[in-house]
Amino acid sequence: GGQIGAQATSQWYLDLWAYAFNTGDTEDFMKVCQVEGYCDEFAHDLERMHTDAYLVKPLTNQYLQTKDIYECSLKKDGTEGICIKFTYLQTPAGFRYLTEEKASEQYDTISTVTGEEINNEQRFFRVLFLEERGDTWVVTHIWDH
């Protein structure tokens, strides 16, 4: 519970996201991802991508630093939770597509890189909103910066 539990969940979320991306196995990820309109779509996109292509170089996420952690609430409905601002480093995955047609497929929640970009690490800044559900934390909103 508390902020320590929420922070651990945010790091776990990032690890599960990478695992799901690399393997197509979203079962554990879906237990902590409860973002309406994103989590189910992400799982569907990954299922399609892993059907259309095969992984040749796994994506990596490295949690760098928690910038801030504080109690917060959603203005829309007053839901209370904990907000976590953090940075992480990502190295993109490499996929080979089964056909040229499949290589041009578009996905709503994931993007792929080609050629030289595959070795470019990128630093990201995210804010997660976590809600306590029973004795566990779940991510219900994500803001990219």
Predicted region positions:
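Core segments of small alpha/beta cavity-forming domains
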Residues: 1-61
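Compositionally biased, intrinsically disordered low-complexity regions enriched in proline and serine
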Residues: 14, 20, 30, 55, ...
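A mature extracytoplasmic/lumenal domain signature
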Residues: 33-36, 46, 63, 68, ...
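A short linear-motif detector with a strong N-terminal bias
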Residues: 40-45, 60-64, 107-109, 117-119
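A contiguous pocket-lining binding segment that forms or flanks enzyme active sites
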Residues: 51-77
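Exposed beta-sheet edge and beta->alpha loop/turn motif
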Residues: 71-145
